[in-house]
Design a protein with these regions (language model features):
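Short helix-loop capping/hinge motifs at secondary-structure junctions, enriched
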Residues: 57-60, 65, 172-175
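Detector for glycine-centered tight turns/loop "hinges" at secondary-structure junctions
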Residues: 34, 47, 62-63, 155
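DPxDG-like acidic metal-binding loop motif
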Residues: 2-55
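An extended, acidic
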Residues: 73-189
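Active-site glycine-rich loop that binds ribose-phosphate moieties when present
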Residues: 28, 67-69
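Short loop segments at secondary-structure junctions
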Residues: 31-35, 45, 54-57, 89, ...
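N-terminal subdomain of lithium-sensitive/metallo-dependent phosphomonoesterases centered on the IMPase/IPPase/PAP
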Residues: 1-11, 178, 185-189
Length: 189
C-alpha cells in the first residue's frame, strides 16, 4: 500500500439509498501510513456532515458536534439510551450478550452513519466487521476527534488493515471488546 492514499465510499449504505431510505452517505478519508489524517462524512439526505483533520476538533453541520465533551457523565454509559450501531453480520449470540448488558443494538444499514452517530453522541458505541478502510477510516478519525475510543474487534489500535472496528465511550467500548473476546473467530466474515 502507498504511504498516503485517499479512500472513498461514494454511497455508504447502498441498499438503503437504492430503496429510498435516507440513511446513506459519502465517506472520504486521507490515510497516511495506515492511519486516517483527514475525514469527511456527508449524509446529504439527512442534512448532516462531519469534518476533521488529525489533531483538530470535530466539526459538524446538521447535528451536534460531539456527545463526548460534556464531562464525566457524557463519557459514561447512559443506561436509558445505550444505543450501539451494529452490522447485520453480528452473530446472534453476541447481539443477545450486548442486550444483556443493557446496551441496545441498532442497525442503520450504514457503517458510516453508525460511526457518525457515535462521533455525535447519538449512539454510545458501534461495532462492525467490515475489512474495508473506506467504511471505517473517516469514522475512526471523527470518533477519536470527539473523544471516543476506536480499536479493531480484538481491542488493538484501528488501522486501515483492520478487519472491523469497535468504537464508543470508554465504558461501552470496553464492554463490547470484552464480549467479543469470548467469541474470538466467530465474527470474521
Amino acid at each position: 500500500m502507498l504511504d498516503t492514499v485517499w479512500v472513498v465510499d461514494p454511497i455508504d449504505g447502498t441498499a438503503n439509498y437504492s430503496a429510498g431510505n435516507p440513511m446513506a452517505g459519502i465517506l472520504v478519508a486521507l490515510i497516511h501510513e495506515g492511519a486516517p489524517v483527514a475525514a469527511v462524512s456527508d449524509f446529504p439526505l439527512l442534512g448532516r456532515r462531519l469534518v476533521t483533520c488529525d489533531g483538530s476538533p470535530l466539526r459538524s453541520v446538521g447535528g451536534p458536534a460531539t456527545g463526548f465533551g460534556g464531562g464525566e457523565e457524557a463519557m459514561g454509559f447512559d443506561e436509558a439510551r445505550g444505543h450501539v450501531g451494529c452490522s447485520s453480520h453480528l452473530p446472534t449470540d453476541i447481539f443477545h450478550e450486548l442486550r444483556e448488558t443493557g446496551l441496545r443494538p441498532r442497525m442503520t444499514g450504514s457503517v458510516g452513519l453508525d460511526n457518525a452517530f457515535v462521533a455525535q453522541g447519538v449512539f454510545d458505541g458501534a461495532i462492525n466487521f467490515s475489512p474495508h478502510p473506506w467504511d471505517n477510516a473517516a469514522g475512526a478519525l471523527q470518533i477519536q476527534a470527539a473523544g471516543g475510543v476506536v480499536t479493531d474487534p480484538e481491542g488493538n489500535p484501528w488501522t486501515a488493515q483492520s478487519r472491523g472496528m469497535v468504537a464508543g465511550t470508554p465504558q461501552v467500548h470496553a464492554t463490547i471488546v470484552d464480549i467479543l473476546s469470548r467469541h474470538t473467530g466467530s465474527f470474521h466474515r
